[in-house]
Amino acid sequence: MLETVPVRCVERKITSLVVDLSGVPIVDTMVAQQLYNLSKTLFLLGVKAVFSGIRPDVAQTSIQLGLDFSEYETYGTLKQALENMGVRCIVEELEENK
């Protein structure tokens, strides 16, 4: 992850990246550290990292490790993160208009 994501972001001129953790069943100390390193690397490349779907146990693991994610935007769900970035879910709008 740490090797490919930053390279792809630069290649594709990505300015913001949502890292959604809602489908990740277990986050141990190594994964939490990798996420932190990824966010710092992206910052240095000018890519804004946004986190969504962080569960309480993931937050606790990060705090226990002394990892400070407070400088990053975090959202409870991917939908909230995307809406805040101005991305609207067209599928839901189509269903609502039926």
From Swiss-Prot:
Places the protein is found: Cytoplasm
Q: PTM comment for this protein?
A: Phosphorylated on threonine residue(s). Phosphorylated by PrkC and dephosphorylated by PrpC.
Q: Which UniProt keywords apply?
A: Cytoplasm, Phosphoprotein
Domain STAS: from-to ranges: 1-85
Q: Name one GO cellular component term.
A: cytoplasm
Looking up InterPro entries in the UniProt record yields: Bact_StressResp_Reg, STAS_dom, STAS_dom_sf
Q: What is this protein called?
A: Uncharacterized protein YezB
High-level lineage: Bacteria, Bacillati, Bacillota, Bacilli, Bacillales
